[in-house]
């Protein structure tokens, strides 16, 4: 198994029968990826529930988003990580639980809150599949990650261990680089819009990474939830046309704007020195950039038979290529 832990099915229910559309609960449904998961679940015809957490308070944008989900056919369920019984009651309503709470320190790092959700799912006993908040780099491949960024991977592995020891059926999704964060800034940390003048290359700019449109991540995720081929496996989303280096991404942008950007380079030593000057949350994120852009951690291994790859499992799903994605910035 990709996660490296033994799996015991125990007394939990078997996977849904072929043709059955599971009832889905999305936790973190107002977040950057979560809102896309809700939309994709509804579009695929699943009875969809969204956890409405009181912690939202008077955040009008999130409240309006929840109301838009309700209008589109979703059911809102009150619940909180601070109220264990509410979690148990919420998961009892559905077959599949998808958690999309933030694992990004510059927003809010909530990965270990999922341990409460694991306990709730175990007690409820009806959940056929749990998809925890992963969606980035596969933490099982990052055992040698640097501090402080390794905390993200370590915490995700703690959650995986709890899931598997509880005998909860699962799917772990490694979606690599969110396109909005990486492509928009031409793979430069701290940028989300592409410059028309200059770009800083990380190292030689030739390390390959994998970029995935966030809407595609959501669509592939929903395809997996009733698929027995993805049960108790890690599934990578690795669109073949989207495995590109920073230089290749920059080249695509240069073709769109009809000019070459002024290029400077940032050596690994300069990057690490710059990283140490940032606060803790920034250092965590920059560590991830280091592993992706200097070490090529997303493409330096082969996907084994014990795992799966979404574009091969679902060739009927047309994914957004980097070339197509970049056009929106012109």
Swiss-Prot record:
Gene3D superfamilies for the chain: NAD(P)-binding Rossmann-like Domain, UDP-galactose 4-epimerase, domain 1
Domain of life (superkingdom): Eukaryota
SUPFAM superfamilies: NAD(P)-binding Rossmann-fold domains
InterPro entries recorded: NAD(P)-bd_dom_sf (IPR036291), NmrA-like (IPR008030), NmrA-type/Isoflavone_red_sf (IPR050608), PCBER-like (IPR045312)
Tissue-specificity statement: Expressed in leaves, stems, leaves and seeds.
Catalytic EC class: oxidoreductase
Binding site for NADP(+): 28-34, 53, 62, 160
Annotated function: Reductase involved in lignan biosynthesis. Catalyzes the enantioselective conversion of (+)-pinoresinol into (+)-lariciresinol and of (+)-lariciresinol into (-)-secoisolariciresinol. Abstracts the 4R-hydride from the NADPH cofactor during catalysis.
Subunit note: Dimer.
Family: Belongs to the NmrA-type oxidoreductase family. Isoflavone reductase subfamily.
Annotated protein name in UniProt: Bifunctional pinoresinol-lariciresinol reductase 2
Native source organism of the sequence: Linum usitatissimum (Flax)
Gene behind this protein: PLR_Lu2
